[in-house]
Structures are given as structure tokens and as C-alpha cells.
Amino acid sequence: MSSKLKVLQVIPKLGYGGAETGCFDIAHYLFENNCSSFLITNGGPLTKFINKKKVKYIRLPVNSKNPIIMLLNTILISVIVFFYNIDIIHARSRAPAWSCFLASKITRKKFVTTFHGTYNFKSKIKKFYNSVMLRSDLVIAGSNFIFSHIK
């Protein structure tokens, strides 16, 4: 007998934008389709609507761009992945993507990113910071326009 697929989504804040509502919808969709669904965010208005019987919600400061906080998030996400035996780590923004990327290396789990918007690639520092969104095992483009942007 196979076990349920366990998917962890990580997004900075769960507001009412397209990325956030998509994350919220996918979290509940996964449960409805025989998967275990986990969600890490730093809060937001949509968190009060999470069905806690369907989605395991964990609050962490994944909205932070502070490198020390991002490193702490890496450790905490790794512990969560090991504890719940998560199969896939799905990052939906750059700051948490760095923590998720490192956690995926530590835990040897699959890493997925979703590109929701365009990013400025002008400076070398920004280009490196943004590059995490393309370092995953699978990159999801939110639209054809975004797909063209990242090609």
C-alpha cells in the first residue's frame, strides 16, 4: 500500500493576491485529492480560512529577507520536512525559496518553485538572489508571459 504524497507549500504571507489565493486553493485541493497538505507562511488574512482538518498550517517568519532569519528558517523547514516526512517542498517567493532550496539539499527532497511575477535582473546581486527560483527540480510559470520572461 502506497502512502499519501506530502506537499509543503511556503509563501511569505497569505493575503488576497493571485499567488496567495492560488497557494490557498492548492493546499485544500491537495487534501481533496488524497495528499497531505502543509503550509508555512508568516500569517495574513487568508490564514483564518484555512481548514485545519485539511491543511497543517505552520507560522514562521518566511517573509523575512534577513539572511540570519532565512538561515534559521532553513533549519526549521528542514526539521519540519524530516518530522512530517514531506515529499515535495514548494516555494512561491524568492526569500522563502532560499530557505526551501537549502532545506531541500539538507533533506534530499524534491524542490519546486512557482514564478508568479517578473523580477529585475539588472545587478549581479539581484540576478543571484532571483536565481533561486530557477534552481528547483521543477519551475512552474504562472502564465505564458512569465514563461517567456524566464526563458
PLM features per residue range, with description:
Residues 1-151:
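Membrane-interface segments of envelope glycosyltransferases acting on lipid-linked substrates or membrane lipids
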